[in-house]
Amino acid sequence: MDRRDRIGDNLMKPCETSTQGALVSINGSETEGTFPTLTTSRLSLREVLPSDAPSLFTVHGDAEGMRWFGTDPMTDIAEADKLVQVFADWRRSGSGVRWAVERLSDGLLLGTCGLFRWNRKWRSCVVGYELATFARGNGYMREALYAAIDYGFDVMQINRIEAQVHPQNAASIQVLETLGFVREGCQRQAGYWRDAYHDLLQFSLLRSDCVRRG
């Protein structure tokens, strides 16, 4: 049996005290040229497909729900089609992987998450994610990130995962801190969207953080 099929037994977990959202299985591997589908107790993290564009447009077109995401809200379905292509290009170029977060109970797309800006020499990357407004408050993104980060540390052999979050995005900050991310500082006016500059908080999670706390 491949060690990735025994994910619940031996592989390193993110720095979280609860086991909810533990990665159950991996099918495929980015390092082996096949898209890695991750499964948790409630979610399937799978490849983002062209057929997902309408759902992505619904998520990204929600101006209030996406106000801290870092881009202007979508106004045309063509923008969602382009985003699907961007995620596919990440994989082809080897710069990262983006998963569609799908609820197992009904196959509904809840959002996406991923690891990108993958610097293989430095063993670092950035984590990004977004969740539909209707799905928030249920721990879905924490569960999805738990699996994605586990994959990053074990399969991609990442040492440092970074995240940038708007200071007013309290829910996202809470998710990161629950997973063990450490706040490193504030990047002043590092982002620009909706005709305004925005400060961004810098977070990181190291492999050694999990070893010390694990």
Can you describe what each PLM-predicted range is?
Residues 89-95, 181:
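Short loop/turn motifs at secondary-structure junctions and domain boundaries
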Residues 64-86, 97-99:
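Conserved GNAT-fold acetyl-CoA-binding loop/helix
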Residues 2-67, 98, 102-214:
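Acyl-donor (CoA/ACP) binding surface of acyl/acetyltransferases
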Residues 86-87, 151:
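A generic secondary-structure signal
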